[in-house]
Design a protein with these regions (language model features):
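Short amphipathic alpha-helical face segments that pack within enzyme cores
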Residues: 49, 109-113, 310, 314-317
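Glycine-rich anion-binding loops and their surrounding alpha/beta cores
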Residues: 2-18, 25, 74-78, 82, ...
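Short, small-residue-enriched loops and turns at beta-alpha junctions
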Residues: 21, 37, 55-58, 97-101, ...
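A glycine-rich phosphate/pyrophosphate-binding beta-strand-loop-alpha-helix module
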Residues: 51, 104-161
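N-terminal glycine-rich anion-binding loops that anchor highly charged ligand groups
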Residues: 3-10, 16-66, 74-82, 310
């Protein structure tokens, strides 16, 4: 679906509108302001003012604004070149981050399990911004050369491994214009939640976690307006950007027709016991690395069981949303058998090896 991202206003006019009559700002205005920044037409004051005003005026809670900013960002993305024969469904599981819980890297691990179970996964991610260890940090620490992955070899990685990691900084180089200012400002802005909206592959189906329940229907509506179908937006009742292992999770599910269905799920739906979130907390990069290796090697310690079950419910739901599993319980069981089989370790090791080979070939 094409979203109009063109406005006749200048950046100065857009900033004035945000400051004085924000109710008159259109999605096209927001996208045009972002384009001016990406094109290098904004000075430091205008850049900081634009980002700050979007946040203070609540534009991050408007689905039309999020969709317009995402569409403009995608216009400048490096788009992977998939092979004509690659018509199979591509999926993702991703969260906004920023929930404050600092849990283990669940979506990263779940994406690997889902790929080993038979789905084709294009995982979009970045370095840590609000936790101790982001998806890119963890994968790199275990031998993946993520900088070697570019638009020209995504198709090959998917063909070989059914898994690829799309490093946001590689595929969205235009975002470098905002990165330093966002860090220096030090508060959340609408750009903090754009990640799930701007996977350059534009997956066919996905599970998207959000850090607060009010953002759930907003994200679902933004995804729908971008043409996404069979996407599920989730938020644990603790304001967790994943499916909770501790209790209930709210789901906003966009079906084939674009209808958004809101319902609640629980670990009981997956045949998995509940655990306190504290039992699934992330730690340092080194600790998370060791935990992932134990999961892949099927050499769990008793303290790993909660994290294992956390992975099962999130992977199981992705398998359910993607149609591989008829029920959530079946999805969790497929995930468990896949993890125990050693297939996930084999996939990860071969994927990491391929990334290093790409680096050698292009270095």
């Amino acid at each position: 679906m094409t979203i109009n991202t063109v406005s006749s206003k200048t950046l100065k006019a857009i900033l004035k509108c945000l400051a004085t009559t924000p109710e008159k700002l259109t999605p096209e205005d927001a996208a045009t302001g972002l384009r001016a920044i990406i094109n290098g037409e904004a000075n430091d004051a205008q850049l900081a003012g634009f980002i700050t005003a979007l946040q203070l005026r609540g534009m991050g809670m408007r689905p039309d604004m999020l969709a317009a900013l995402a569409a403009e960002t995608q216009r400048h993305a490096l788009v992977p070149k998939l092979e004509p024969s690659q018509t199979e469904m591509v999926v993702d599981i991703v969260g906004t981050g920023g929930d404050g819980w600092n849990t283990f890297n669940i979506s990263t691990t779940s994406s690997l399990v889902a790929a080993a179970a038979g789905l084709q996964v294009a995982k979009h991610g970045s370095r840590s911004s609000s936790s101790n260890c982001g998806s890119a940090d963890l994968l790199e620490s275990l031998g993946c050369d993520l900088n070697a992955i570019g638009p020209d070899n995504v198709a090959e990685l998917l063909r070989r491994h059914r898994f690829c990691f799309l490093f946001s900084s590689t595929f969205h180089p235009s975002m470098r214009y905002l990165a330093q200012t966002r860090r220096e400002l030090g508060f959340p802005t609408p750009f903090n939640v754009l990640g799930p909206l701007i996977n350059p592959v534009q997956p066919d189906r996905a599970v998207v976690g959000v850090h607060s329940q009010p953002l759930g229907p907003v994200m679902a509506e933004a995804l729908r307006s971008l043409g996404r179908r069979n996407y599920a937006v989730v938020c644990g009742d603790e304001n967790l950007d994943e499916i909770s292992i501790a209790g209930s999770t709210q789901v906003w599910h966009i079906d084939d027709s674009g209808h958004i269905d809101h319902y609640t799920i629980h670990p009981d739906n997956f045949g998995v016991p509940t655990h306190p979130l504290s039992a699934a907390a992330g730690s340092t990069l080194e600790d998370n690395q060791a935990t992932l290796q134990r999961l892949l090697n099927n050499t769990l310690k008793p303290s790993d069981v909660a994290i294992r079950d956390f992975v099962l419910v999130n992977t199981g739901f992705l398998l359910f949303v993607s149609g591989m599993a008829r029920t959530m319980k079946q999805g969790a069981e497929i995930a468990r058998l896949t993890l125990e089989s050693g297939k996930v370790k084999d996939l990860f090791d071969s994927f990491a090896r391929s990334t290093r080979e790409f680096n050698t070939a292009t270095g």
